[in-house]
Curated annotation (Swiss-Prot):
UniProt-annotated location(s): Cytoplasm
Alphabetical keyword list: Cell cycle, Cell division, Chromosome partition, Cytoplasm, DNA integration, DNA recombination, DNA-binding
Species, as recorded: Chlamydia muridarum (strain MoPn / Nigg)
Residues annotated as the enzyme's active site: R152, K174, H245, R248, H271, Y280 (o-(3'-phospho-dna)-tyrosine intermediate)
Protein name: Tyrosine recombinase XerD
Length: 301
């Protein structure tokens, strides 16, 4: 284990405040950033801020390679470093920001569920034998909400009663930015059914709880629980590796396949950059090619 200098703890504490207050970054993301920065401070190691320079970046990258870390992991660590160096410069703790060139990382195209697989997944909770009616209806509403809106799992867990209207849900995304996302009639019906017939049963244990989706203890549903529920149902309907994010991918890709505008999809997904949304154009293209080879009589000619 590398030595933890007093400076490390001091910098991490200040960086945490910077990320949380100045940048408005979610707690789990703050934790991930700080873990990467602490690793940098320990691996080099950094004893004073004067040691944070271009050479320290090169040394850190070299040690990451020695640890046989993937390019994706290294890219994530360097993104964290770039934000950290900006914080240090802004706080006048360093005079010059070290230059960081991100390694080239191929974007892995997500595995996309077909519409048939999505339909099977959406219906699975109510078709699962011996499943408590509250759990089944709550999970059905969760699945429909994911697929109808494309929101992230953290955004779903943060939904409150006041965020839901007849046609839209108000979503609080990264950087605490809010956006309005339209919701389908069917998804709204599953939410209404859950709210009127089942949610109250567990809210009695915690009457002041305003979050939409509750655990059996009447508390806000945790991300880990949502992941477990989704993967449980997914294993019953497909051999693909499925997570809550898979429904976000399916939402975007199926919209593109039906000629939806890319900019509108970007807004609904809450992507800051259009490049993050453009990956779905490649997935949609692959889907079109696959259908061509499957159905066109002369595709192999």
């Amino acid at each position: 284990m590398s030595m933890l200098f007093p400076l490390h703890q001091q910098l991490i504490e200040q960086f945490t405040i910077f990320l949380s207050v100045d940048r408005g970054i979610a707690p789990l993301s703050v934790q991930a950033y700080c873990q990467d920065i602490l690793l940098f401070l320990q691996r080099v190691p950094i004893e004073t801020t004067d040691m944070i320079n271009q050479e320290s970046v090169f040394l850190f990258v070299e040690k990451c390679h020695q640890a046989k870390e993937s390019e994706t992991t290294l890219a994530r660590r360097l993104i964290a470093l770039k934000v950290f160096f900006h914080f240090l410069k802004d706080a006048k703790l360093i005079h010059q920001q070290p230059f960081i060139e991100h390694p080239k990382v191929w974007k892995r195209l997500p595995s996309i569920l077909s519409t048939e697989e999505v339909n099977s997944l959406l219906n699975q909770p109510l078709n699962t034998l011996n499943l408590d009616a509250y759990i089944a209806n709550r999970d059905t509403a969760i699945l429909y909400t994911f697929y109808a809106t494309g929101i992230r799992v953290s955004e779903l867990c943060d939904l409150c009663i006041g965020d839901i209207s007849d046609d839209f849900i108000r979503v609080t995304g990264k950087g605490r930015k809010t956006r309005l996302v339209p919701i389908s009639i069917k998804a709204r019906q599953t939410i209404d059914s859950y709210l009127t017939m089942f949610r109250e049963r567990f809210q009695k244990k915690n009457p002041s709880e305003e979050h939409v989706f509750l655990s059996i203890r009447g508390k806000k549903l945790e991300r880990s629980c949502v992941w477990k529920r989704i993967t449980f149902y997914a294993k019953l309907v497909t051999t693909k590796h499925i997570s809550p994010h898979s429904l976000r991918h399916a939402f975007a890709t199926h919209l593109l396949n039906n000629q939806a505008d890319l900019r509108i999809i970007q807004e609904m997904l809450g992507h800051a950059r259009i490049s993050s949304t453009e990956i779905y154009t490649h997935v949609a293209s692959e889907s079109i090619i696959e259908k061509f080879h499957t159905h066109h009589p002369r595709s192999s000619s």
